[in-house]
Amino acid sequence: MVVPTEPERGEQWVLRYFDHVFPVAEGTQSLPMHVLVGRQHYRLAYWKVGDAETNYRRFFDVGTLAAIRVEDPEVFAGSHELVLDLLRAGTVDALRVDHPDGLADPTGYLNHLSEAAGGAWITAEKILAPDEPLPVGWHVAGTTGYDASWRIDQLQVDPGGAVRLGALMHELTGRGPIEYERVVEQAKREVINGSLAAEVN
């Protein structure tokens, strides 16, 4: 099947599976389907094995969001062309960068982005621990506001409800609020050993 893409590239062959669209490597489009699938730059796999067999970096455990090498100037230029065009046209005024600390070089990336964006207002979606500062070298206006909303939430929560919430926590987990740090650590380990196992191993 062919679909039109950018005018300068003409038409391209793609594989479609419901709403998934996969590019077809040049020169393989005339092969029988079972051979064609084996000759691509990717391997199709049953979705339930993704956590065990993934061989690329993902955004957490979201299989459709692959990490790309934005530290490579060509990759940066190609992946940011539309966003920077929208900024220059005044269609968007600011940028939000989700989880930049997952990048190979977050400081270098944010500096490069700030320069390419002409000093546009940029925020980083980074959830800071209560005693964690935003890295000084990041060229961002600040975070997207989770730390501020946490403080605002605290103003609106009645401290008298702590006993009832503690009882609910004990009912749901078998542990009390005093063990909160242990519960958090256990949850993090479950994620690392479960949905992120392919990235760790």
Language-model features: where?
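Alpha-amylase-like alpha-glycosidases and glucanotransferases acting on alpha-linked glucans and related
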Residues: 1-94, 100-201
